[in-house]
């Protein structure tokens, strides 16, 4: 509740909900659907992280550095950037499978600095995938 309230009150975000903890979602997979956001709203948060002082510099820098050293999901957003000098900071997420055998959610959210000086933010969410984890990750990379 505190995180949901902070994001709504202090960041002005409306198109999301944080209702369940990770433990609660692992215990009851239906609770995964209570936590949601739109890709655009998530990109807005990344833009704020990059361009607005949200926290003390130490903490905000830690978040950015952690995203740039992300070891998971190299087969997602990072895959098409491998081999060039782009810098990517991202955070991945992979949900459990629901009772139908679908991956409840797989995502990758982040920012990219291209060698030519251009930059962008990106958020790709896949819900209820019937594909394998590898195939779902390829879909994210292909976007």
What does each of the following model-derived ranges do?
Residues 44-87, 92-143:
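Structured C-terminal helix/loop/strand segments within mature extracytoplasmic catalytic/sensor domains
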Residues 1-54:
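Mid-domain, small-residue-enriched loop/turn segments at the edges of structured enzyme/sensor domains
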């Amino acid at each position: 509740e505190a995180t949901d309230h902070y994001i709504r009150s202090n960041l002005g975000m409306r198109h999301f909900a944080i209702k369940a903890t990770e433990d609660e979602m692992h215990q009851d997979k239906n609770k995964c659907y209570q936590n949601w956001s739109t890709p655009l709203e998530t990109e807005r948060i990344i833009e704020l992280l990059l361009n607005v002082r949200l926290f003390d510099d130490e903490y905000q820098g830690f978040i950015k550095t952690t995203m740039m050293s992300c070891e998971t999901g190299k087969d997602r957003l990072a895959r098409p950037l491998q081999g060039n000098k782009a810098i990517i900071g991202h955070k991945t997420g992979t949900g459990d499978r629901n009772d139908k055998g679908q991956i409840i959610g797989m995502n990758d959210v982040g920012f990219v600095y291209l060698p030519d000086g251009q930059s962008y933010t990106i958020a790709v969410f896949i819900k209820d995938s019937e594909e394998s984890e590898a195939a779902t990750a390829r879909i994210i990379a292909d976007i």
